[in-house]
A protein has these predicted regions:
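ATP-dependent helicase/translocase motor core
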Residues: 1-222, 227, 231-246, 260-264, ...
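Short glycine-/polar-rich loops that comprise or flank the Walker A/P-loop
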Residues: 78-80, 110-114, 219-221, 283-284, ...
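Conserved nucleotide-binding/hydrolysis micro-motifs of P-loop NTPases
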Residues: 88-90, 122-125, 230-232, 270-273, ...
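Amphipathic alpha-helical transducer elements in NTP-driven molecular machines
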Residues: 92-100, 266, 286, 294-297, ...
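Phosphate- and divalent-cation-binding pockets in alpha/beta enzyme and binding domains
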Residues: 235, 274-275, 299, 322
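Short acidic low-complexity segments
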Residues: 249-259
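SF2 helicase catalytic motif II
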Residues: 279-313, 317-318
């Protein structure tokens, strides 16, 4: 798995190389910032976008001054982020309080609180304390565009629970309850949720209504919808087009030039895994993962580790059959999803009809094949195919063995 290999490799490098703070900045942090489009000077100089060793006041030093390792600037001269670096062998968390002091100083001097990053070059933490989030480990740095939106959210975010649900899209009681539970969880500063809904009860509709609510409330600018097959990708694309007016990009189908303007991206897991690193870690604000089960975790779990977004898993797998890994991936205790609407309840409330198992067989499977019992039409058909009907004399067990052999069963399974 690519993301896991990268993380494992960097952590193994940590044990092999002991870079001091200056080397950590030059060899690791500078390179990662450049990869996200930041204009970083090759030496210790500063650029309009990235200041190094930026002096601030109000520090607990004899002079009252301190130097921020990095400050990332917006076009308006306001700080978007501050980065505190430690040498590679130190715990990244050792820089947490120092980073906060620098953020306090920048807020006091500019009127805008920057997003906080602290790192040892290998482990990177983001701390968006202005929005009430606790620090969390992330895979890389945000691009300028993603940081700008993170800052903007402080002004435009509305209360999710007071933002109406589009009941034309998801108006059934259990659908609205699922959306409300997710939004309550997000409002409580959790970043992941898992919905269990029986097949046919409208998981895609819940996804669309949830996406619209987060877009309307300023909680999301760009949304990624993941599914496991091209047929589902097409269905989801049609459904989003029908119920939203947002610019849509269907990965593997839409023209590539539409990708940069899209607010909703729909992709299969295999399609997204090929080139997800084209996006920075903060590009998407919400990821909705359809058909979330163990195989998705095993094959595509890196997508959820790479992107620093709110994440919602959707599955029709009954609660008692959901794996621990799936529950953990979406931040839920084992067998305790955020919302659950099982098949039995859907049938009881007449939102689904009970299924019936119908067993079909054929005369040949029941009675075998005997020339004396063939119709004139069957005899004529066999003769047209060059088969002598008189050679056919098989009992039911022989027919079953010939048709339902082990290889056939394996192919069906």
């Amino acid at each position: 798995v690519k993301a896991d290999k990268i993380r494992t490799n960097t952590l193994s490098l940590k044990s092999s190389f002991d870079f001091n703070e200056a080397e950590t900045r030059k060899r690791l942090i500078d390179a990662e910032l450049r990869s996200e489009g930041w204009d970083v000077a090759l030496d210790n100089e500063s650029t309009e976008q990235v200041s190094k060793e930026y002096e601030v006041d109000g520090q607990p030093t004899t002079t009252g001054k301190g130097r921020c390792d990095y400050v990332l600037w917006d076009d308006n001269g306001k700080p978007l982020a501050v980065i505190e670096a430690k040498r590679t062998r130190k715990d990244a968390n050792a820089g947490r309080e120092q980073a906060k002091l620098y953020a306090d100083a920048l807020e006091a001097s500019t009127g805008q609180r920057p997003v906080i990053f602290y790192t040892n070059g290998y482990e990177i933490y983001i701390w968006d304390d202005a929005q009430g989030y606790a620090p969390r480990l992330i895979f890389g740095y945000y691009s300028k565009d993603s940081l700008q939106y993170l800052i903007l959210q402080r002004e435009i975010k509305k209360d999710l629970n007071s933002t109406p649900i589009d009941t034309k899209v998801a108006g059934r009681l259990y659908q609205m309850e699922s959306i409300s539970r997710i939004c309550e969880r997000f409002s409580d500063k959790h970043r992941k949720a898992l919905i269990v809904q029986a097949t046919g009860t409208g998981k895609t509709r819940v996804s669309i209504a949830l996406a619209k609510r987060l877009l309307d409330a300023g909680w999301a600018k760009r949304i990624l919808f993941l599914c496991d097959r091209k047929e589902l990708r097409k269905q989801a694309g049609n459904a989003f087009n029908e119920h939203t007016k947002e610019p849509l990009f269907i990965k593997g189908k839409s023209k590539k030039e539409l990708a940069s303007k899209a607010r909703i991206v729909i992709a299969t897991y295999p399609g997204m895994i090929q080139n997800y690193e084209e996006y920075d870690v903060g590009h998407f604000d919400l990821i909705v993962a359809d058909e979330s089960h163990r195989s998705i975790y095993n094959k595509y779990g890196e997508l959820f580790k790479y992107f620093d977004a709110l994440q919602v898993g959707l599955t029709a797998t009954p609660v008692e059959m959901i794996s621990r890994s799936t529950s953990q991936l979406f931040g839920c205790d084992y067998k305790m999803p955020t919302a659950n609407y099982p098949l039995e309840q859907a049938i009881e409330e007449k939102n689904l009809v009970p299924f019936k198992v119908v067993t079909h067989t054929t005369q040949f499977l029941r009675d075998g094949i005997k020339a004396s019992e063939l119709t004139d039409e069957q005899i004529a058909e066999l003769e047209d195919q060059g088969i002598d009907p008189n050679t056919l004399d098989f009992d039911a067990k022989q027919v079953d063995k010939a048709i339902f052999n082990k290889d056939t069963n394996r192919a069906i399974i």
